[in-house]
């Protein structure tokens, strides 16, 4: 596999051989549970993940009505949520539309975690649409895939700020340790590097610092804690971020289309 973000003609003709045997070139390959592509768009991984979640949602529908709701939620956490959390700050930092397939599959599975009647499918005879899922997410304290990606990204950035992440990863970021809290401007906890490529803007190196600076400043302005958020230990920080994301997720009407997810406001 040759990584490139362009359809470069010389690269298409480039072959590698060992001992006279040409190595087969592939466009995508699974590595540590994540499907890598030669152009690093993550489309293959996202499509495969959406299919897997949709298939696992079928298991939830078969269990619905047979087991208590707490068991359904355990199954959801095992078969759905675990896949959404895994490396989501790697494959999920693209545009909102790029993960629509996954969000659709997640909403399908969420409709099955309550034993009450939730219309899960479109009725072609009556024209009835599937029920809205925003209240189901709220009742069960679940994060959408957009906010799961945001949470994982913020936690990763906080580990880097606390210098508890691996050194090689920490070296990729520029932590600002000289913060003037008396300034009228919002402090920047990470210095954001310049970028000429749109593809780079959709990586943790660029989007991570932007998201962290914005969210942490918003939380510090709420003054709900005597300790600034950026100075918290990891577990209190995770809890604070989860509450913030759930609160922002529950705001507004039931229409997800107009939902302003923090991940896409930076």
Regions found by a protein language model. Give the residues of each.
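Short, charged alpha-helical motifs in flexible N/C-terminal segments and linkers
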Residues: 1, 100-174
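Short, conserved micro-motifs composed of acidic
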Residues: 1-27
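Basic, alpha-helical interaction scaffolds
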Residues: 20-90
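Structural motif
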Residues: 23-26, 66-75, 131, 140-149, ...
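Extended, well-ordered alpha-helical segments in internal regulatory regions
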Residues: 79-94, 115-116, 148-165, 210-215
């Amino acid at each position: 596999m040759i990584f490139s973000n362009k359809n470069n003609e010389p690269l298409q003709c480039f072959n590698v051989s060992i001992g006279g045997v040409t190595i087969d070139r592939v466009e995508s390959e699974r590595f540590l549970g994540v499907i890598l592509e030669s152009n690093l768009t993550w489309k293959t991984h996202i499509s495969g993940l959406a299919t897997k979640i949709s298939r696992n949602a079928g298991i939830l529908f078969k269990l619905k009505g047979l087991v208590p709701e707490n068991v359904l939620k355990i199954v959801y956490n095992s078969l759905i949520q675990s896949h959404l959390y895994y490396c989501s700050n790697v494959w999920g930092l693209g545009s909102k539309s790029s993960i629509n397939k996954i969000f659709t599959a997640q909403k399908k599975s969420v409709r099955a975690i309550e034993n009450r009647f939730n219309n899960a499918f479109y009725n072609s005879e009556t024209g009835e649409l599937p029920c809205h899922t925003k209240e189901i997410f709220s009742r069960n304290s679940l994060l959408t895939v957009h906010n799961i990606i945001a949470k994982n990204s913020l936690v990763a950035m906080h580990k880097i700020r606390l210098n508890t992440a691996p050194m090689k990863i920490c070296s990729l970021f520029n932590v600002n340790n000289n913060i003037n809290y008396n300034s009228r401007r919002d402090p920047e906890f990470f210095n954001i590097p310049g970028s000429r490529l749109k593809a780079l803007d959709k990586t943790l190196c660029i989007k991570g610092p932007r998201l962290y600076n914005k969210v942490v400043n918003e939380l510090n302005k709420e003054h709900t804690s005597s300790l600034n958020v950026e100075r918290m230990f990891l577990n209190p920080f995770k809890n604070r971020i989860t509450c913030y994301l759930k609160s922002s997720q529950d705001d507004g009407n039931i229409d997800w289309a107009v939902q302003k997810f923090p991940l896409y406001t930076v």
